[in-house]
């Protein structure tokens, strides 16, 4: 591919053309100025980037040596002293409160679900942006949230018995969320607006209204009749849709045709763990979809059966408040974008020495200039009404790396003419050195931080790699019961509240990774708002609608107020290493652990390498579909590498397991015409060789990250064959 030289940068022609012809026009930023500033940014900050990565390696070497001499720490005080001596654990400064300004309500004050989607997939991105609202009826009917017992099977057509169960569940939810002064929602026979109040007629003929009349936010009318009532609890809206001729409403005594939930309040458009972006071609796709979202013109032609339609961004909703004043309600999730971390470089742009530029610097500059289509001088202000750009920054290790990200953002703002602190930062608390120094990490970004989030998956991967030499780790399924996990989750909330995030920023919790198990999610994920999290990750718009019910049941602001006075989680618990003290696993248990890890690795890696798919639903050993991305891959690969290193398993056993499970993964993908079987020839299957690398060379991967192997192997495939098209 030809390259264009600009101020010492060698930019692949297609990327250059995209920037000059599509991204920059309309932003007020001229190409010459853009590339001049971009070059300065790269050549001045790339050396700092490399130095920070070298520091990671130096810490790891010191930790490896300590563990080799001492094993798993039994004297946690001595271990903590060692971490302080080497500068891994830093002194904690005085208390402070964050000062982030111009933060949209979706982040500052509204508690609710958050989606994370691969920005390279336009359909997923549009679905996520439009997932601000979802049908509660559809979410219940189409999932296992409603049992199929007693004749309530989903079936091919509409099942009235199942519909009755859905309606009963939804009415019971309304009793909790927007209770009536008298009677139950199941007995409602009619709704009307009278003198600014919701007038409710029960089947008995009695009249009632809302227990709290202020929960009526507004109405929408067509042809003089109210067709929807907008209610509100804990800052979240629920819309009761009336249609006497509707498929459901016609048979409903109150003509309620649907109940629509305000669902995914925010959505992260991901350039990182859920995508496979290894070169200019891939980055252009990511950036062009982000451009379409910021300009509002992204669209995707969707085919469902015989029905073909074009999906676009939903327009805002119009209502009239009880006093007769019109107002607008957002119909799209507030979009954040996750840039990559500090580790990777990308061949799309080379510096003056011919080296690949740090991908995190490239992401910052390009995604920010694209955001000007929304927040710039001539911006639409359809995403951020407060004029802010929201960047989630992953995989940072400690406050020095957070400060470096702040420096990048500051330089980008100066280059693009943005006001200082326009670019807000979400800090992923997913690396051990960030966890133990979280207060100082937040301090480093106190004018920008809008989000801290525990990422159990990556955090576990880092836990394993950090203490690789300490001994064999406990089984992967036992990790959630380990002492460090509960302390880590509570510590994140405690530190966030101590730093004044409540009412200003999100304190988030991690992903529900089983998209088919919605009944279990409804039962369990309420623990996140109860723990003080004002957002948590969900795997689909449907899951967002169901998880939204939890934020009606739990007043997160009240929970956070109560948690501010609790004793902070113990650092010593966080520092405890999850090594199996006296492993007594049977050979069958060991093999099952290997099988499960291998299946997850192969099922994900084969689609990443061969098809460029960065996020997949992969069946586990029990045939439960699990959402897999690079974070889950990191855990599985590091866990296998750890057991191999400590002799729990042999290399021959690992290879045999991977080969046997590859055949099973091949069978599971037999219906995919784009799939390339691995077991046909293990030696020539680049995907299988990548899986081998991730495990057999797992100890030498930087911090246990999977990106170096994945990128190298994906580029190898793209160079030697025409990649499979999805």
UniProtKB/Swiss-Prot annotation:
<feature type="binding site">
    <location>
        <position position="458"/>
    </location>
    <ligand>
        <name>Mg(2+)</name>
    </ligand>
</feature>
<comment type="similarity">
    <text>Belongs to the malate synthase family. GlcB subfamily.</text>
</comment>
<keyword id="KW-0816">Tricarboxylic acid cycle</keyword>
<feature type="binding site">
    <location>
        <position position="116"/>
    </location>
    <ligand>
        <name>acetyl-CoA</name>
    </ligand>
</feature>
<keyword id="KW-0460">Magnesium</keyword>
<feature type="active site" description="Proton acceptor">
    <location>
        <position position="338"/>
    </location>
</feature>
<keyword id="KW-0963">Cytoplasm</keyword>
<dbReference type="InterPro" id="IPR048356">
    <property type="entry name" value="MS_N"/>
</dbReference>
<dbReference type="InterPro" id="IPR048355">
    <property type="entry name" value="MS_C"/>
</dbReference>
<dbReference type="InterPro" id="IPR046363">
    <property type="entry name" value="MS_N_TIM-barrel_dom"/>
</dbReference>
<keyword id="KW-0808">Transferase</keyword>
<dbReference type="Pfam" id="PF01274">
    <property type="entry name" value="MS_TIM-barrel"/>
</dbReference>
<keyword id="KW-0479">Metal-binding</keyword>
<comment type="pathway">
    <text>Carbohydrate metabolism; glyoxylate cycle; (S)-malate from isocitrate: step 2/2.</text>
</comment>
<feature type="modified residue" description="Cysteine sulfenic acid (-SOH)">
    <location>
        <position position="615"/>
    </location>
</feature>
<keyword id="KW-0329">Glyoxylate bypass</keyword>
<dbReference type="InterPro" id="IPR011076">
    <property type="entry name" value="Malate_synth_sf"/>
</dbReference>
<feature type="binding site">
    <location>
        <position position="430"/>
    </location>
    <ligand>
        <name>Mg(2+)</name>
    </ligand>
</feature>
<dbReference type="GO" id="GO:0006097">
    <property type="term" value="P:glyoxylate cycle"/>
</dbReference>
<dbReference type="InterPro" id="IPR006253">
    <property type="entry name" value="Malate_synthG"/>
</dbReference>
<feature type="binding site">
    <location>
        <position position="430"/>
    </location>
    <ligand>
        <name>glyoxylate</name>
    </ligand>
</feature>
<dbReference type="Pfam" id="PF20658">
    <property type="entry name" value="MSG_insertion"/>
</dbReference>
<dbReference type="GO" id="GO:0004474">
    <property type="term" value="F:malate synthase activity"/>
</dbReference>
<dbReference type="GO" id="GO:0005829">
    <property type="term" value="C:cytosol"/>
</dbReference>
<feature type="binding site">
    <location>
        <position position="338"/>
    </location>
    <ligand>
        <name>glyoxylate</name>
    </ligand>
</feature>
<keyword id="KW-0558">Oxidation</keyword>
<feature type="binding site">
    <location>
        <position position="539"/>
    </location>
    <ligand>
        <name>acetyl-CoA</name>
    </ligand>
</feature>
<dbReference type="GO" id="GO:0006099">
    <property type="term" value="P:tricarboxylic acid cycle"/>
</dbReference>
<feature type="binding site">
    <location>
        <position position="274"/>
    </location>
    <ligand>
        <name>acetyl-CoA</name>
    </ligand>
</feature>
<dbReference type="Pfam" id="PF20656">
    <property type="entry name" value="MS_N"/>
</dbReference>
<feature type="binding site">
    <location>
        <begin position="455"/>
        <end position="458"/>
    </location>
    <ligand>
        <name>glyoxylate</name>
    </ligand>
</feature>
<dbReference type="Pfam" id="PF20659">
    <property type="entry name" value="MS_C"/>
</dbReference>
<feature type="active site" description="Proton donor">
    <location>
        <position position="629"/>
    </location>
</feature>
<comment type="subunit">
    <text>Monomer.</text>
</comment>
<dbReference type="InterPro" id="IPR048357">
    <property type="entry name" value="MSG_insertion"/>
</dbReference>
<feature type="binding site">
    <location>
        <begin position="123"/>
        <end position="124"/>
    </location>
    <ligand>
        <name>acetyl-CoA</name>
    </ligand>
</feature>
<feature type="binding site">
    <location>
        <position position="311"/>
    </location>
    <ligand>
        <name>acetyl-CoA</name>
    </ligand>
</feature>
<dbReference type="InterPro" id="IPR044856">
    <property type="entry name" value="Malate_synth_C_sf"/>
</dbReference>
<dbReference type="GO" id="GO:0000287">
    <property type="term" value="F:magnesium ion binding"/>
</dbReference>
<protein>
    <recommendedName>
        <fullName>Malate synthase G</fullName>
        <ecNumber>2.3.3.9</ecNumber>
    </recommendedName>
</protein>
<dbReference type="InterPro" id="IPR001465">
    <property type="entry name" value="Malate_synthase_TIM"/>
</dbReference>
<comment type="function">
    <text>Involved in the glycolate utilization. Catalyzes the condensation and subsequent hydrolysis of acetyl-coenzyme A (acetyl-CoA) and glyoxylate to form malate and CoA.</text>
</comment>
